[in-house]
């Protein structure tokens, strides 16, 4: 079946040429810049950064600048300086700025750039990142794209700045698939939607005629697996984002719950409801549609998530009386409980870095989003409230997105929070939204 609502093709339309540094700007200072952010410190003071409006013949330059600034500010690691404080007006982004003018306003880093339209209709976006106190250029790049992809250029530039100043990959050039919820609570329409990580460019990828739940990206970013109640019973589908084509992953006799891809994209792990009311974890090989049962209990085993190397699986099970977190080998061997605190644990998901597991915890009437080490130690709750659920990791493993429903609220909303628990932000969506899943970095 083809869903003809919208084309969600993910295109690689950029070419980058790094380090386009003019000979006159090459300096003899050490390659390691003075300005940097130690992202591994417990408490981080945001870095003051000046982001000048990119020069352009129209509003496109300032628009791109605004997206870059918003990305960096939302990370909690950067504090963009108000443009009203700028002393120097940049007229030539290729020339070295007057560093003293930027040091006066405590801009520890400076971004300049330019947008020009090419004869073939494409846009050329150039930017430079400067260390103002070190008096040197840190990075210079240019990108070519089509005019309708200007926001993506902004995200890519923000990622480049983030990586140069923190030493780690950014997460701004990514997408999020989620469940869009509209209509009254008694007749809620739940359809799949996809958007940029900042909430822009929302597009619907299912028509809402049947409830759709638990969307998850494939590692190649081109496919989404999800559960649909089309026909009255829950089934798992695989949707091709580029073409809108979808296929039934498996038509199992019982309910199919929480499908998720393996890191290599060749398998889907999911829970199947048994006749006795229990649920066990299975994998399906997408190449030949063969299934393998991994757990065999009288409990509810669900919400399986692979480790980044594919060697282990974390899941939730009430085999001990209430839902707790367990880790087992990818073949189902050696299951062991890792959660030890009071309350119930659910929706575990392994960090892309491999060092942490995020989860939902219910305790004393509160739903919390937390993280723990993969052996269960070091549990930390990042945010708590009436109802918080469904964490998903940014591809760099530094930020989580989840959904929250406040007491008395009409429906859930999406939020992000970093690992310090101090930087929580709402992501604006057209309607209520739940069950987000973050994509890997786009290419």
UniProtKB/Swiss-Prot annotation:
<dbReference type="Pfam" id="PF07676">
    <property type="entry name" value="PD40"/>
</dbReference>
<dbReference type="Pfam" id="PF04052">
    <property type="entry name" value="TolB_N"/>
</dbReference>
<dbReference type="InterPro" id="IPR014167">
    <property type="entry name" value="Tol-Pal_TolB"/>
</dbReference>
<keyword id="KW-0132">Cell division</keyword>
<dbReference type="InterPro" id="IPR007195">
    <property type="entry name" value="TolB_N"/>
</dbReference>
<dbReference type="GO" id="GO:0051301">
    <property type="term" value="P:cell division"/>
</dbReference>
<dbReference type="InterPro" id="IPR011659">
    <property type="entry name" value="PD40"/>
</dbReference>
<protein>
    <recommendedName>
        <fullName>Tol-Pal system protein TolB</fullName>
    </recommendedName>
</protein>
<dbReference type="InterPro" id="IPR011042">
    <property type="entry name" value="6-blade_b-propeller_TolB-like"/>
</dbReference>
<feature type="signal peptide">
    <location>
        <begin position="1"/>
        <end position="33"/>
    </location>
</feature>
<comment type="subunit">
    <text>The Tol-Pal system is composed of five core proteins: the inner membrane proteins TolA, TolQ and TolR, the periplasmic protein TolB and the outer membrane protein Pal. They form a network linking the inner and outer membranes and the peptidoglycan layer.</text>
</comment>
<keyword id="KW-0732">Signal</keyword>
<keyword id="KW-0574">Periplasm</keyword>
<keyword id="KW-0131">Cell cycle</keyword>
<comment type="similarity">
    <text>Belongs to the TolB family.</text>
</comment>
<dbReference type="GO" id="GO:0042597">
    <property type="term" value="C:periplasmic space"/>
</dbReference>
<comment type="function">
    <text>Part of the Tol-Pal system, which plays a role in outer membrane invagination during cell division and is important for maintaining outer membrane integrity.</text>
</comment>
<dbReference type="GO" id="GO:0017038">
    <property type="term" value="P:protein import"/>
</dbReference>
């Amino acid at each position: 079946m083809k869903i003809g609502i919208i084309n969600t093709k993910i295109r690689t339309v950029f070419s980058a040429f790094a380090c386009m540094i003019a000979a006159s700007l090459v300096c003899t200072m050490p390659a390691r810049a003075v300005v940097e952010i130690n992202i591994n410190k417990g408490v981080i003071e945001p870095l003051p950064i000046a982001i000048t409006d990119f020069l352009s013949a129209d509003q496109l330059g300032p628009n791109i600048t605004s997206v870059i600034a918003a990305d960096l500010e939302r990370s909690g690691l950067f504090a963009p300086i108000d443009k009203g404080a700028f002393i120097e007006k940049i007229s030539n982004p290729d020339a070295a700025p007057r560093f003293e003018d930027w040091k006066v306003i405590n801009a520890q880093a400076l971004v300049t750039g330019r947008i020009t339209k090419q004869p073939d209709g494409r846009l050329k976006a150039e930017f430079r990142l400067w260390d103002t106190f070190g008096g040197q250029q840190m990075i210079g790049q240019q990108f070519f794209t089509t005019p309708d992809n200007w926001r993506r250029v902004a995200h890519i530039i923000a990622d480049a700045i983030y990586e140069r100043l923190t030493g780690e990959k950014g997460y701004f050039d990514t997408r999020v698939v989620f469940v869009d919820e509209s209509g009254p609570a008694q007749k809620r329409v739940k359809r799949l939607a996809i958007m940029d990580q900042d909430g822009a460019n929302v597009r619907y990828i299912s028509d809402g005629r049947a409830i759709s739940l638990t969307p998850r990206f494939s590692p190649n970013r081109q496919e989404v697996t999800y559960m649909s109640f089309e026909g009255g019973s829950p089934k798992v589908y695989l949707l091709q984002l580029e073409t809108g084509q979808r296929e039934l992953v498996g038509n199992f006799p019982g309910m199919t719950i929480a499908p998720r891809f393996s890191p290599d994209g060749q398998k889907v792990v999911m829970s199947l409801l048994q006749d006795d009311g229990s649920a066990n974890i299975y994998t399906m090989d997408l190449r030949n549609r063969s299934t393998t049962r991994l757990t065999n209990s009288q409990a509810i085993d669900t919400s399986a998530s692979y480790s980044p190397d594919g060697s282990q699986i974390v899941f939730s099970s009430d085999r001990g009386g209430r839902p707790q977190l367990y880790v087992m080998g990818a073949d189902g061997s050696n299951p062991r409980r890792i959660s030890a605190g009071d309350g119930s644990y659910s929706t575990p998901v392994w960090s892309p870095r491999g060092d942490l597991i995020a989860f939902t915890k219910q305790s004393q009437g509160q739903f919390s989003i937390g993280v723990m080490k993969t052996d269960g130690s070091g549990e930390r709750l990042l945010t708590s409230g009436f109802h918080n659920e469904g964490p998903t990791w940014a591809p760099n493993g530094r930020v989580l997105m989840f959904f929250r429903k406040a007491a008395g609220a009409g429906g859930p909303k999406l939020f992000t929070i970093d690992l310090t628990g101090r930087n929580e932000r709402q992501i604006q969506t057209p309607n209520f939204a739940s069950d987000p899943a973050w994509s890997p970095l786009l290419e």
